[in-house]
A protein has these predicted regions:
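Conserved beta-propeller blade repeats
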Residues: 14-44, 72-80, 84-87, 104-128, ...
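Serine-hydrolase catalytic core recognition
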Residues: 56, 126, 261-467
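Predominantly five- to eight-bladed beta-propeller fold
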Residues: 5-36, 45-100, 290-305, 357-368
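Short loop/turn segments that connect beta-strands within beta-propeller blades
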Residues: 2-3, 92-96, 142-145, 192-195, ...
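Short glycine/serine/proline-enriched coil/turn segments at secondary-structure junctions
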Residues: 130-132, 157-159, 230-233, 278, ...
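Beta-propeller fold detector
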Residues: 3-13, 99-102, 147-152, 198-203, ...
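Structural motif
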Residues: 54-59, 85-87, 132-139, 183-188, ...
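Internal hydrophobic scaffold segments of catalytic domains
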Residues: 1-5, 31-55, 139-141, 275-277, ...
């Protein structure tokens, strides 16, 4: 029977299919195929998209021969009445039954498949409402199709998707869950069977970031954190250890004031740590499980680079336009920099809100900034309120409902402070440039402050976020 194709469904049609039609479609969420086997069983699950009511958009291929051709595709725009509808189905190849699971809670919700138990009896998914301020982590009984909510999360104005983490431990018996519910990104451990919170693993006025490794036998997790240690730049990746069975039992493992990139051995006994700053060359060490350095490894020989005139950029700190919030940035100078001269300044920008283009680690040429400085400019990139979840919820969500203007005043005020601090900056010759969201921001900046910015370069700017 394995060699004979068997059709299990008959209701497919264009834009309502189990196997996405990638041609002419925007990048999807589930890949080219949305059907997957459930481990250890004769069942499969499928995520089906219904795009039949989603608006059509069009492209004209003017290079097509012998004449231009029209391409029609489906695309959701902000505020559209009709958007993609998602379905979860479980099929049985023995009974040839395909069952639609009742996953709906909110109109126009979006779903992610998270985990399937090793015995194939339980499937977990996460659903979000359309405003993206509520979500459920749900368990599906594969046999019966019954859905149970394990964790409900609600956070306004919106949930942080960029740094979200949902990890299933001990074959799904526990769930490690990251939340900004107290205003700061922290980790919580739940009992999956009951949905009860077992422990809040991290807490405080700082941000717990990406998890690098989880030791389920030793009952520890290893993760990067930001802003916990006084005197350390809040953008630097600092490695910590937390106990799974004790609340807020957090231990610092990499104390140096630098950004760390750590690889932990399979035994959890050792870790290789490469740490640096924009002006400090990488230091590569081996640490034991307590964070103690037990060996220093090789380091790069950059003397030829310095002999060619290369100069490391400098990190700086200024205030936001509110006069209270600290902002961090990086400054590049020409190789032949002369402090007695005056230089025009260019701000390389990206508004976020999931990422700030403010490097923290050592690099010889950070995109175009080093090269641009050699043309006789002071080049900076500086963070701003609304730019990243690494600084906490209030900082991250500052730009909500103000997509165009929220970063502009901070960029302008940062440049004004630097010009007042450094006589070599000419505040009458200010340029701004960026790509994508940065292109959007640079165009908005010169239109909003035409007497401050002298020139703007906008690359592929998304100037109307309604489309």
């Amino acid at each position: 029977q394995d060699t004979i194709p068997v059709q299990l469904t008959t209701d497919g049609e264009p834009n309502y299919t189990f196997n996405r039609e990638d041609e002419g479609k925007l990048e999807g969420r589930f890949g080219a195929e949305s059907t997957h086997w459930i481990p250890g069983s004769h069942r499969f699950y499928a995520v089906r998209e219904d795009n039949r009511k989603v608006r059509d958009l069009w492209l004209i291929n003017s290079l097509s021969t012998p004449y231009p051709t029209l391409k029609t595709y489906k695309a959701e725009l902000a505020g559209d009445k009709h958007v993609t509808q998602y379905e979860l189905l479980i099929g049985d190849v023995d009974t040839r039954e395909v069952k639609k699971i009742d996953i709906n809670r909110w109109p126009d919700q979006y779903i992610d498949i998270l985990y399937i138990s090793k015995d194939g009896k339980r499937l977990y998914f996460q659903r979000y409402n359309r405003p993206w301020n509520q979500s459920d982590i749900c368990e599906v009984d594969v046999e019966t199709g019954k859905v149970r909510v394990v964790i409900h999360e609600e956070n306004k104005p919106y949930l942080d998707y960029q740094m979200r983490n949902v990890s299933f431990l001990n074959d799904g018996k526990e769930i490690l869950f990251r939340s900004e519910r107290n205003g700061w990104g922290h980790y919580y451990l739940y009992d999956t069977a009951t949905g009860n919170l077992k422990n809040q693993l991290t807490d405080g006025i700082w941000v717990a970031g990406p998890v690098t490794k989880i030791d389920t036998i030793g009952r520890k997790m290893y993760f990067y954190g930001y802003g916990r240690e006084k005197g350390i730049d809040p953008y630097y990746y600092i490695l910590y250890e937390a106990q799974l069975d004790r609340p807020n039992a957090v231990r610092l493992l990499t104390p140096e004031n630098a950004s760390h990139d750590v690889s932990i051995s399979p035994s959890y006994r050792y870790m290789v740590d490469s740490y640096s700053t924009v002006s400090q060359e990488p230091v590569n060490v081996v640490r034991n499980r307590n964070g103690k350095v037990i060996m220093t490894l090789e380091k790069p020989d950059l003397q030829p680079v310095y002999e060619m005139g290369w100069k490391a950029p400098e990190r700086f700190k200024v205030k936001a336009a509110d006069g209270v919030t600290d902002l961090y940035g990086v400054m590049w100078k020409p190789a032949d920099f002369d402090s007695t001269k005056v230089y025009p300044i260019i701000s390389n920008v990206y508004p976020g809100s999931f990422f700030e283009y403010v490097p923290t680690r050592f690099t010889i040429n950070d995109v175009y900034n080093t090269r641009l400085a050699q043309l006789g400019f002071i080049v900076i990139t500086v963070g701003h309120r609304g730019g990243t979840p690494m600084r906490g919820k209030a900082y991250h969500t500052y730009g909500y409902n103000n997509m165009r203007d929220y970063p502009l005043a901070d960029d302008k005020y940062a440049i004004e402070q630097l010009a007042a601090r450094y006589p070599f900056i000419d505040a009458t010759k200010v340029g701004i440039y960026g790509h994508s969201g940065g292109g959007f921001m640079s165009a908005a900046a010169i239109c909003t402050y035409p007497d401050f910015y002298s020139a703007a370069v906008s690359s592929a700017g998304n100037h109307d976020n309604r489309i």
